[in-house]
């Protein structure tokens, strides 16, 4: 899967990994020949990555709602990042960054933004539908992956529409990146971490406002 240039590049990057990483595959076991082929390529890719660093290993296969897919995990950590498909093409950089960040390499963002991500409350399950030729998709994928590293309440799966065509068609997705949150259409187009966080804050503020409006009236409301 990796040519000599990519292998050399990735090996150099993996030297910056500080913590152990386990790549956990969820292989496809059905009758779709295309998915079976991509599942085999996924297994090959994971093995090639693990061979480049003693801090990276391939775990036992597990079931998942999307196959083929794989999770990038850190033992003892709740970090939840998954690629459903092969993150090559424009998404190879997303894969490299995810490996580094799950492996303990610092997320490169403004400290105020990092602190704000860490302060996000509640569980948030994001899914980004992307394609390997999409130029705007990596910005979204990388932002949500980094947020999932920074905050265990945030979970992210990047879905390659070319692999999971049935899911894309069922949702009527016509353009990528398409972002879903907790199963609902949440946004589309290029968004960086700050824009995603701003949108999350707006949703949280609206939810709190609606919750307050549904409560019984207060005799006295003390603010401060």
Task: Show the residue positions of the predicted features.
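Local sequence-structure signature of Cys/Sec-based thiol-disulfide redox active-site neighborhoods
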Residues: 3-46, 117-158, 220
């Amino acid at each position: 899967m990796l040519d000599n240039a990519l292998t050399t590049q990735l090996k150099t990057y993996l030297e910056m990994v500080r913590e152990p990483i386990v790549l956990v595959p969820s292989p496809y076991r059905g009758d779709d020949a295309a998915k079976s082929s991509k599942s085999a390529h996924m297994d090959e890719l994971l093995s090639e990555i693990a061979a480049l660093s003693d801090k990276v290993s391939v775990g036992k296969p597990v079931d998942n709602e999307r196959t083929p897919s794989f999770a990038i995990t850190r033992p003892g950590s709740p970090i939840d990042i998954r690629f459903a498909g092969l993150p090559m093409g424009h998404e190879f950089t997303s894969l490299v960054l995810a490996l580094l960040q799950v492996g303990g390499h610092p997320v490169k963002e403004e400290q105020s933004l990092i602190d704000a991500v860490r302060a996000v409350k509640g569980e948030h399950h994001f899914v980004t539908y992307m394609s390997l030729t999409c130029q705007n998709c990596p910005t979204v994928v990388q932002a949500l992956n980094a947020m999932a590293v920074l905050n265990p309440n945030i979970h992210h799966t990047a879905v390659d529409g070319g692999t999971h065509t049935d899911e894309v068609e069922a949702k009527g997705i016509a353009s990528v990146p398409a972002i879903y949150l907790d199963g609902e259409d949440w946004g589309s187009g290029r968004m960086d971490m700050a824009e995603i966080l701003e949108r999350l804050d707006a949703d949280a503020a609206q939810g709190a406002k609606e919750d307050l409006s549904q409560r019984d009236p207060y005799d006295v409301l003390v603010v401060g």
